[in-house]
């Protein structure tokens, strides 16, 4: 009889491993950090379990074990739960004019300077001109040995959040071009990796100065947000960090929010297109336990952003840029917007930011066959509006709790602008309809 400490998914994988005489990779959550240390030593001594990663923000350890060793773990009173160390994948897909970011740069002289965004992804091409002087700490958790991006997805995501557009003469500028970029390479150059690698990258970023963390990746299927990666994301929000996560590209089917998009405390972002409608590919809610997700949507159709040298993600524009679609591209729009909000008021907490973003979002169109009372499961509270959100952030006031409809209501008069230079160059994104699914 199997223990209630692990799910049917874990049971299925264990049975397959037994039949094939293969090891299994799982994440074990303990009742406390003390029990985590003692049982980890016991596991190593037994020889049937290899410890891959210990986590500090939650009492959990990623291990590789023989199926026969599960009895030892499940019988231990201090073991609370055993999760499968799943493989997660990048989530591949105009734009800032739609969310009114250029007005924030020009009218409020706010480009996100002083705020650090960490992209936990396939790494970054730190030599790209759009990141000159903007890349802070980098680290590798994929086993490659460096954070260099041999895939291109992480570079594109980082550019959307905070690229300067230098290689395009200011044409392709990220939402917060003054922000500092951190990069944690948690996914291999093939675009996939274990949950435990992503969790290690998140933990490193949270403990090394990241203000905003972006995850443009996820697992397949519908999640209830109780898995290992979602638990780590919630713990990081409890530290005071803002977590922005892509919803996934499994729409228009309902109940397609995977992990970590289903995590309760993160900002889960779906995608809109150039018609200001919800993109067909954008994953829909509810979560497996019936909660509303995504929280909101942002542009994610055919976004032009930085291309990592020698890579071919999306449709290549030129030596320095490529076009991609997906909620992967929507999430960094919001991560960049959060940086602008924190620049306006660094005292805002994660829930302040989330509530403000949702309350200032605007209604957009959805397809006729989805015009139901379940609209929140399609677009959350709507498409983000950068100008209104940042104006409220700077004013020190909370927006009204109800969701506004187009046109956007007038925000309060903002206070003094931070004394920084603004990005005066026009911002342009090209938009197409194709998206690259999770594969």
Model-flagged regions — what are they?
Residues 26-27, 62, 116-119, 137, ...:
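Structural recognition of the beta-strand scaffold that forms the well-ordered cores
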Residues 158-161, 182, 186-187, 256, ...:
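Hydrolase catalytic cores
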Residues 105-137, 144-194, 208-211, 238, ...:
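Subtilisin-like serine protease catalytic core
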Residues 74-77, 83, 123, 128, ...:
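Sec/Tat-exported extracytoplasmic proteins
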Residues 1-103, 117, 129, 423, ...:
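Autoinhibitory N-terminal propeptides
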Residues 212-214, 298, 343-439:
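C-terminal subdomain of the subtilisin-like protease fold in secreted/lumenal serine endopeptidases
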Residues 35-37, 68, 164-168, 183-265, ...:
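Substrate-binding/access-modulating region of protease and related hydrolase catalytic domains
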Residues 26-29, 144-148, 187-191, 220, ...:
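Second-shell loop/turn segments in exported
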């Amino acid at each position: 009889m199997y223990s209630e400490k692990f799910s049917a998914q874990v049971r299925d994988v264990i049975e397959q491993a037994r039949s094939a005489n293969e090891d299994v990779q799982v994440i074990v959550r303990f009742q406390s950090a003390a029990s985590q240390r003692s049982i980890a030593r016991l596991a190593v001594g037994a020889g049937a379990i290899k410890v891959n990663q210990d986590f500090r923000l939650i009492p959990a350890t990623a291990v590789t074990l023989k199926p026969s060793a599960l009895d030892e773990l499940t019988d231990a009173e201090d073991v609370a739960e055993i999760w499968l160390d799943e493989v997660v994948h990048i989530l591949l897909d105009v734009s800032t004019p739609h969310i009114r970011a250029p007005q924030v740069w020009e009218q409020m002289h706010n480009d996100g300077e002083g705020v650090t965004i960490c992209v936990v992804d396939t790494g970054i091409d730190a030599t790209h001109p759009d990141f000159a002087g903007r890349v802070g700490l980098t680290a590798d958790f994929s086993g490659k040995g460096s954070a260099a991006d041999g895939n291109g997805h992480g570079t594109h995501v980082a550019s959307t959040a905070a690229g300067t557009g230098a290689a395009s003469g200011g044409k392709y500028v990220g939402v917060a071009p003054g922000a500092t970029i951190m990069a944690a390479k948690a996914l291999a150059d093939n675009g996939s990796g274990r949950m435990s690698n992503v969790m290690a990258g998140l933990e490193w970023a949270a403990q090394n100065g990241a203000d905003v963390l972006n995850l443009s990746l996820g697992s397949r299927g519908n999640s209830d947000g109780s898995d290992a990666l979602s638990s780590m994301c919630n713990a990081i929000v409890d530290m005071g960090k803002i977590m922005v996560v892509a919803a996934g590209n499994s729409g228009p089917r309902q109940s397609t929010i995977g992990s970590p998009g289903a995590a309760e405390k993160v900002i889960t972002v779906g995608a809109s297109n150039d018609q200001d409608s919800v993109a067909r590919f954008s994953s829909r809610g509810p979560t497996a336990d019936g909660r509303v997700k995504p929280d909101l949507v942002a542009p994610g159709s055919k976004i032009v952003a930085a291309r990592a040298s020698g890579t071919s993600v999306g449709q290549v524009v030129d030596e320095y840029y490529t076009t991609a679609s997906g909620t992967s591209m929507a999430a960094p729009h919001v991560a960049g917007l959060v940086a602008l909000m924190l620049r306006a008021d660094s005292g805002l907490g994660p829930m302040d930011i989330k509530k403000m973003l949702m309350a200032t979002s605007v209604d957009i169109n959805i397809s006729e066959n989805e015009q139901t009372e379940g609209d929140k499961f399609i677009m959350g509270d709507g498409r983000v509006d950068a100008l209104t959100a940042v104006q409220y952030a700077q004013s020190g006031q909370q927006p009204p709790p109800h969701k506004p409809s187009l046109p956007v209501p007038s925000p309060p008069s903002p206070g003094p602008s931070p004394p920084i230079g603004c990005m005066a160059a026009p911002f342009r994104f090209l938009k197409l309809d194709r998206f690259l699914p999770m594969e």
